[in-house]
Amino acid sequence: MTINQLIVIGGGIAGLTCAESYSHLKPNDKVTILSCSPILKTVCNVQKISKVLESFEVFETQFTDIEFKNPNISVIICDVDSIDINNRIVKTDKGNFKYDYLSICSGAKPNLVKESPYLIGIRDTETIVDLKNRLSNAKRIVIVGNGGIALELIHEIKNCQIIWSIKDKHIGNAFFDKDAADFLFRSKQIIDDDNHDKKNVVKEQQQQQQKDGILLNEDELIAKNQNISSQSNSSLYKSESGSALGPQWYSKYNFKTTDQYNKNNQEKKYNFNENVNIQYSTFLDEIYSNHDKKLNQEIINNNNNGDGDDKEDWPIYVKLSNGNLFGCNFIISATGVIPNSTILTKDNNNNNNNKIIKLSNEGAIIVDEQMKTSVDRIYSAGDVCSIEWSESEVWFQMRLWSQARTQGRYTAQCIANESVKNTPQQDNLDQICTNFEFELFAHATKFFGFKVIMLGLYNAQGLNLNLDNNNQNEENQDNIKIYTREIIGEQYVKVILKNGRLIGSLLIGDTDLEETFENLILNQIDLSGYGAEILNPEIDIEDYFD
């Protein structure tokens, strides 16, 4: 029996999933993970929600734990210098490693808007710890970007003024249209107001109990009032317990500012409106240090805009494209990521033969339907790769943790299949993943404390529709209809039908519709006769289409 050597570059979700999945399929083969960090990201507590949709928790683990759990996996902490394609060798600062198969899962890196010691990007544990440390003394920060990380930060950072610069006309444009974004915006206001009122009730009860000689702690009082609040406000969303979905990294950290600043603002009511100053349709133009000679002139020019009347001596100032100037403690760049393929670009430029790994225009590694690159025996998965082979109308690539896990598992299956091709082992190899998982886009996550399920073309991707100006019940080109229903503070449901068939759905809150809508998209049942009634809450649709 031939023993193959698989080398995996990268210790993120895609890389570790690929390595562990291949180890399961080929326990006698050798697997080596080349990681620049001793901390690897692993997936635990996987729960199947439906055929395609699943939830899981992401944990960070020491590489020694991975080696202990998988005897045929070894982890080398190193920096990859280059790949010798002709001789199948990966060159690193810790030596050279020969491979039979190579899986490049080097992920992506933050797309920083500017270079500055006062600007950080959020990508790994180190940057999260850096953020937490900086926030401990921060009074005001600037967040640039409108994607998932920006939304999570806006929700989690408390008692700190936030200037939020977004290039779009509404929040969350990377995931949501204007209607869904408005639902989240208004729901957060309602919930924040309700939470503030509950704290005031607790405070009043504590004062009264002190007079009566009885004192319960705050947790006991909140628990005591939980039934009252739930009866008086049925639309209040109640966060469900259970496993965190996607990269719920923020749940492990307490993002609060200094005690002194909290004390100074103890009586100030912070909600989404007052705490966050959203600068719509803007981008970061310039960054000035407080010693910059150009700063004084900018302050003079902006005496009626931004921070013109602000007497605080800030370490850094930000000028936005609308001319507004804001002082802050630091800046968070949350403008997405770019494929981490720098080493391959260098290799391709220095390669004198025709064996080069083809990259897309954005620098991602192009793979075929077997996750194979343009070079034999080299595969790729996760944020660093570009999938252009899926023929499904309702699947598209998005750089998400859920897709990184799927791609890592499927890549391991493809490599294992190739390694036993035309051998006696071919018929005995397990099949843990197929390309069926690329038939439907499905992602579960949370935003602003709400469970969010995205299915198919949930935001009409690729349909050339302007949802921000679209009448939800008006018929569009290609017989496309969009229906929505919402209960502010509780749930939002959107469905997109093309020629009477469901092709996408967005579910926010506890709707219990994810499995039903997934089946309707996959089975392409004609729903044209139902119209908007498909979202009628009085109809038990999950039973009707069971």
Curated annotation (Swiss-Prot):
InterPro entries reported in the protein's UniProt record: FAD-bd_OxRdtase, FAD/NAD-bd_sf, FAD/NAD-binding_dom, FAD/NAD-linked_Rdtase_dimer_sf, Rubredoxin_C
Disulfide bonds: none
GO molecular function: oxidoreductase activity
EC numbers, comma separated: 1.8.1.-
Database matches in Pfam families: Pyr_redox_2, Rubredoxin_C
Cofactor annotation remark: Binds 1 FAD per subunit.
Cofactor(s) the record lists: FAD
Record keyword Ubl conjugation present: no
Protein keywords: FAD, Flavoprotein, NADP, Oxidoreductase
Family, per entry: Belongs to the class-I pyridine nucleotide-disulfide oxidoreductase family. PYROXD1 subfamily.
Record protein name field: Pyridine nucleotide-disulfide oxidoreductase domain-containing protein 1
Species, as recorded: Dictyostelium discoideum (Social amoeba)
High-level lineage: Eukaryota, Amoebozoa, Evosea, Eumycetozoa, Dictyostelia
